[in-house]
Amino acid sequence: MSLIATVGPTGGVKNRLNIVDFVKNEKFFTLYVRSLELLQAKEQHDYSSFFQLAGIHGLPFTEWAKERPSMNLYKAGYCTHGQVLFPTWHRTYLSVLEQILQGAAIEVAKKFTSNQTDWVQAAQDLRQPYWDWGFELMPPDEVIKNEEVNITNYDGKKISVKNPILRYHFHPIDPSFKPYGDFATWRTTVRNPDRNRREDIPGLIKKMRLEEGQIREKTYNMLKFNDAWERFSNHGISDDQHANSLESVHDDIHVMVGYGKIEGHMDHPFFAAFDPIFWLHHTNVDRLLSLWKAINPDVWVTSGRNRDGTMGIAPNAQINSETPLEPFYQSGDKVWTSASLADTARLGYSYPDFDKLVGGTKELIRDAIDDLIDERYGSKPSSGARNTAFDLLADFKGITKEHKEDLKMYDWTIHVAFKKFELKESFSLLFYFASDGGDYDQENCFVGSINAFRGTAPETCANCQDNENLIQEGFIHLNHYLARDLESFEPQDVHKFLKEKGLSYKLYSRGDKPLTSLSVKIEGRPLHLPPGEHRPKYDHTQARVVFDDVAVHVIN
């Protein structure tokens, strides 16, 4: 039985807002800042403190809000990664944060001496905002830069306060952090640290500008080309996989924000939730789950295996839509399960994407969200002269709406696979259009990245040893870039281009060991888009094309 039931915020179904709009809303932003201040200032043993809420995800590996402690717990966080419960466990996780945040906001609102009724109403309407990195990777300055933010004080006057969205201050550093190097000495969360262990925000902004196009491309393909739960939900190997999973794209954001020259908090699963940006990030992950569910209305959680042990699920346990999502209880001894989580209204929230669709049929909602995905994430190909390939790609992404014939196109990807735990830390693989040793670091050479979000763990990490052969895969989609130089996506044209242009990759990690398990393939899969259809389909009557003779060089 839990001491805190997970029921979501009160006051009916309200929208979680894009952080870009949220920071412009005086009342919401003021209440959010003040509420974070309140939760972050609480004693770290308080179950409703920011520290305890963040600690559910990873360290300090203690039970959260349990009336009676369990025996023989598996020493890990509660979070589920690399398995089919990844999206739904995090849905309940966000909900408990949101309800406690709203409670703090109501407490804050009652301190206002003027227009108190309006402030209390705003607090009741407050929901956790999201960072739509698939559309606009650079968040507002209030999230990434500003040491102080402007809010409205209790007397109605404007004031400047320290920004609680930028970092969390540990008070104190928890003893459980001791085996984890720099994390045992950093007094605050740190993003993109340099070799001197200092936060490097200019470097992070540079990375965001570089990766924005490929993150949008991955988001689009993830939503459009994964129609089975096992392929959509997590970054493990799945049969007939053609696009990155929701978790894989999620991993990219964690590593981008957290990993600089060394690991920062967002880059390590045990520490990530202590960074306030984690909650903006994961709220968008949940929003993408809602979009995907809308265009796949009859698909939900399937069965699988929990490779990694968690505090709530034993290692290698069979899991499915009825698996208890510890430590989140609806009431008494009734634990939330994925089967109850398809409808976000049960938890008191929605997203603006669905504003005009309430009460609509599932077919109407599916088509409307399909169009929204095309418009928001189906970005036009990179700048260049308009050509046949450009027009064809625009048709497939719904940028042009009218097509009367069955359109056909090859979908070209760099298909990457590796042992996730081989290097004992998080790492990144960055790919470039460049020959071996070529001029690879210019923006127009960058193609994309694949990231392993796993963090450094002590040598005694049983979970790491149990999963040392666990394979992770990822995809970098090339058509977006090929369209600026080629007239077609036919194999002979793409093959000639890649042979002449060259492909290289660079491994970014703290050590100097090579990634010996790495497999890189250039693949083309035939697509077709039937007349009047919104969603491209893979043409299984034709074989995929694999270029075995296109060398992918290593940049040292």
From Swiss-Prot:
<comment type="similarity">
    <text>Belongs to the tyrosinase family.</text>
</comment>
<keyword id="KW-0560">Oxidoreductase</keyword>
<feature type="binding site">
    <location>
        <position position="81"/>
    </location>
    <ligand>
        <name>Cu cation A</name>
    </ligand>
</feature>
<dbReference type="InterPro" id="IPR008922">
    <property type="entry name" value="Di-copper_centre_dom_sf"/>
</dbReference>
<feature type="binding site">
    <location>
        <position position="57"/>
    </location>
    <ligand>
        <name>Cu cation A</name>
    </ligand>
</feature>
<feature type="binding site">
    <location>
        <position position="254"/>
    </location>
    <ligand>
        <name>Cu cation B</name>
    </ligand>
</feature>
<keyword id="KW-0503">Monooxygenase</keyword>
<dbReference type="Pfam" id="PF00264">
    <property type="entry name" value="Tyrosinase"/>
</dbReference>
<feature type="propeptide" description="Removed in mature form">
    <location>
        <begin position="379"/>
        <end position="556"/>
    </location>
</feature>
<dbReference type="Pfam" id="PF18132">
    <property type="entry name" value="Tyrosinase_C"/>
</dbReference>
<dbReference type="InterPro" id="IPR002227">
    <property type="entry name" value="Tyrosinase_Cu-bd"/>
</dbReference>
<keyword id="KW-0186">Copper</keyword>
<feature type="binding site">
    <location>
        <position position="282"/>
    </location>
    <ligand>
        <name>Cu cation B</name>
    </ligand>
</feature>
<keyword id="KW-0470">Melanin biosynthesis</keyword>
<comment type="function">
    <text>Copper-containing oxidase that catalyzes both the o-hydroxylation of monophenols and the subsequent oxidation of the resulting o-diphenols into reactive o-quinones, which evolve spontaneously to produce intermediates, which associate in dark brown pigments. Involved in the initial step of melanin synthesis. Melanins constitute a mechanism of defense and resistance to stress such as UV radiations, free radicals, gamma rays, dehydratation and extreme temperatures, and contribute to the fungal cell-wall resistance against hydrolytic enzymes in avoiding cellular lysis.</text>
</comment>
<feature type="site" description="Cleavage">
    <location>
        <begin position="378"/>
        <end position="379"/>
    </location>
</feature>
<feature type="binding site">
    <location>
        <position position="250"/>
    </location>
    <ligand>
        <name>Cu cation B</name>
    </ligand>
</feature>
<feature type="binding site">
    <location>
        <position position="90"/>
    </location>
    <ligand>
        <name>Cu cation A</name>
    </ligand>
</feature>
<dbReference type="InterPro" id="IPR050316">
    <property type="entry name" value="Tyrosinase/Hemocyanin"/>
</dbReference>
<keyword id="KW-0883">Thioether bond</keyword>
<dbReference type="InterPro" id="IPR041640">
    <property type="entry name" value="Tyrosinase_C"/>
</dbReference>
<feature type="cross-link" description="2'-(S-cysteinyl)-histidine (Cys-His)">
    <location>
        <begin position="79"/>
        <end position="81"/>
    </location>
</feature>
<dbReference type="GO" id="GO:0042438">
    <property type="term" value="P:melanin biosynthetic process"/>
</dbReference>
<protein>
    <recommendedName>
        <fullName>Polyphenol oxidase 2</fullName>
        <ecNumber>1.14.18.1</ecNumber>
    </recommendedName>
</protein>
<dbReference type="InterPro" id="IPR016216">
    <property type="entry name" value="Monophenol_mOase_fun"/>
</dbReference>
<dbReference type="GO" id="GO:0004503">
    <property type="term" value="F:tyrosinase activity"/>
</dbReference>
<dbReference type="GO" id="GO:0046872">
    <property type="term" value="F:metal ion binding"/>
</dbReference>
<feature type="binding site">
    <location>
        <position position="254"/>
    </location>
    <ligand>
        <name>substrate</name>
    </ligand>
</feature>
<keyword id="KW-0479">Metal-binding</keyword>
<comment type="subunit">
    <text>Heterotetramer.</text>
</comment>
